[in-house]
Every structure is written in C-alpha cells, then in structure tokens.
Amino acid sequence: MIKQLIAEFRKQNGRHPAIFDHYEEDQNCLWHCLHMARTQNLCHAPEYLRPGKSEACAARSFFRDTRETLHAIVFEQFANSPEHREILLFNDNLACAFYTDHYNVFVTVRGW
C-alpha cells in the first residue's frame, strides 16, 4: 500500500517509477518501524544505513483507516518536508515499510 502511494506521488510530480524490488532493505525498514512503535519514539537509524542511502521516517496518529493515514504521511508530511520530499522524488531505488499499532502508523522509507 505504501509503495503504491509513493508511486502515485512520484507520478504526480513528473518522476519516473522507482525500483521497489529490494526485499532485504524492505525488511530493514519494517524492523525500524517496529522499533519506533515499541519505543513510541520517532527516530532515524543512521547506524543501519549503508553508504549512499538516505532515510525518511514518519509517525502519525491513526485515522479511520490505514490507507487514509498513509496518504496523509506521503502527501502531507513527506511532501511538505524538503528533505523527505527529495528522498521520495530523486532516488531511483526505494525500500519502504509501515507498521500500525493501536494509535499510530509508523513509516520508514530508504532511498539510494
């Protein structure tokens, strides 16, 4: 679901499709989302980034459904942050994951 929203965001901004075929890095993103949920702390994990990669993280209170919340994260939070926007739009390779707990949605996107 998050990959489709990022692809839609890229398309609306005139960017070509990103390559999302990175299972191992997607799992690393999921691990980071779980860590943020467990600690209830929005944080970055630079020590786990490989050279040349950048990371965007977000947390948002859960709306009525997961898709609506993820849409707000991509099209509002990430879109309105120059650094996060750059990661989504100007990296050819992206890995991402999200995790929903009872009250929040946590997202990690890594680009290179």
PLM regions: where:
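Surface-exposed patches in mature extracellular/periplasmic domains of secreted proteins
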Residues: 12-28, 40-50, 84-101
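Soluble non-cytosolic domains of exported or imported proteins
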Residues: 1-4, 19-27, 64-73, 78-79
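Disulfide-stabilized extracellular recognition modules
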Residues: 64-112
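Short, surface-exposed glycine/acidic/tryptophan-bearing loops
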Residues: 25-70
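Extracellular disulfide-stabilized recognition modules
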Residues: 1-15, 51-52
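Non-transmembrane alpha-helical segments in soluble domains
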Residues: 6-7, 30, 34, 58, ...
